[in-house]
Amino acid sequence: NITRLGEGMDTQGKLAKNRMEDTLQVLAAFRQTCLENGDPPLFAVATSAVREASNGHEFVHRAKKETGIDIKIIPWEEEARLTLEGVFWKIPDNNRKVITLDIGGGSTEFILSQGKEISGFCSTSLGVVRLTEKFISRHPIDEKEFLSLKNHLQKELQAVKKKLSTFRPELLIGTAGTVTTLSALKNNIYPYDPEKIHASVFSREDAESILADLKRKSLSERLAMKPLEPGREDLIIAGTAIVLETMRAFDCETLTVSEYSLREGIILKIVNSI
């Protein structure tokens, strides 16, 4: 469920009431499903949008009161560590220098690692919801708007490269909805099959081709592309642009897709503590 909890954060600095309501409805539905299936223990975390929002703690309080779900707001260091746990669960790193690209709605994280040890981290405000709100207003895409988005990404990614110093990745891994959607589109995987998505690889040329096709389409035409999840039809442009410009900035010809990420990292942490 794509509820766009971080919508409006750039301009308001807080979670929008309607998006909080949408998210609370989804959480309530999740809670009901759990109650109908033996009431297993729940572990919920919040990241960028709730972490940064002036009313983030209000949202957490409401979630507890209205749904019974305890949400923990985790710092970026813990988010990065748990994300890597999930990513490397089924993708061997072979002691290579890796950049893991985690694209969210409010932010995008760049996690540097070698031998599963984090050697660097950079969190940016390059989230797909934020970028779409700021740069994209027309579908099919207006080229002037897209050029502004592209220039912004290139500028921000140069700052990321500078912060990460001389780190040169041997492997680029992508996680979250944008990259899994790109893999599904490239390989025409429908219905969605996580086992076919995980560890799949697409090239810079693949990303360029998919982006060019998406830019020409209206929102309804994109939705007709079955692998594309409803609610992602406008966000996929900014997401694909992030992927493509990252590949260019770090001179990576391919990206390996991880179906597993923060959620699986949390599960592994729980299992390992038993």
Where are the predicted features?
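Helical "lid/coupling" subdomains associated with nucleotide-phosphate turnover
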Residues: T3-R4, G8-N37, T47-K97, L112-G115, ...
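Conserved beta-strand/loop subsegment of P-loop NTPase cores
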Residues: P40-A44
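Short glycine-aspartate micro-motif
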Residues: V98-D102
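Short, basic and Ser/Thr-rich N-terminal targeting/leader segments
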Residues: G104-G106, T175
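Acidic, divalent-metal-coordinating active-site segment for phosphoryl/phosphodiester hydrolysis
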Residues: G106-L112
